């Protein structure tokens, strides 16, 4: 018997990431090749954006995806989020010329407060929320705080792009297939301060740290390369990374819903005080997923260098949080 369709909301649906994301969702990459989906697409109530969204929907129709059971266009989150199972919050206010980070935070606080309230009002209480739009961790925190009736654990931020970027850098360094690397961790904020940590990682069962055995490469090449990869792509392409961000969003939700088979992945999730990270801070942690739930990998040893890096990225998150506290409900 065919499965009942799942409802997936995507915000910023006519944007660059949306364009890379929607066709893959409709093709079954997000929730499985036997799972029909209904897309509920949100764009800003601007004539140009809504017209662009119509064009994207025309293209989606023209793909004749067997799993696409329906789609609707919206300019109001109160209708876009009705009865949804999954929310991909991609749309966010980009940083314009001369804009301070605090201006960016407050502009996004308004968007994500409204979206959190709408999720609280009309989405399923079991909705799985992934925030992609930057600053992703803090935007997820704002949405979570604006939706008191949805469990906090259902709000996540995307660290998977950093995770995947780190995996590919390690694979290149070791000249091995990327799929052979396991147990990589990315701690903290989705920003250049995040800390990719391969101390526990294995390749073909052997320690990645021992195989590389180069602390200077870790500190001076690996960590900065992963941290500044987004900027390097803008420099090369003239546009921000959209397809790789969409791919990471698909990986994140796919694994959360369908499981990781014991493999470690990185998700930005609300802390419960693990690893000395204050409760409710949305922070990149290592997790495994099964039966639609993620579970943190606990008890990993934190050395002095790692603690320093983890505190540095935490301080940035706490600063962002402090910057939006007065805007929260």
UniProtKB/Swiss-Prot annotation:
Keyword flag GTP-binding: no
NAD keyword on record: yes
Catalytic activity: (S)-malate + NAD(+) = oxaloacetate + NADH + H(+)
Active-site positions on this chain: 190
Any one biological process term the GO annotation gives: tricarboxylic acid cycle
Entry-linked SUPFAM superfamilies: LDH C-terminal domain-like, NAD(P)-binding Rossmann-fold domains
HAMAP family membership: Malate_dehydrog_2
Name of this protein: Malate dehydrogenase
Native species: Polynucleobacter asymbioticus (strain DSM 18221 / CIP 109841 / QLW-P1DMWA-1)
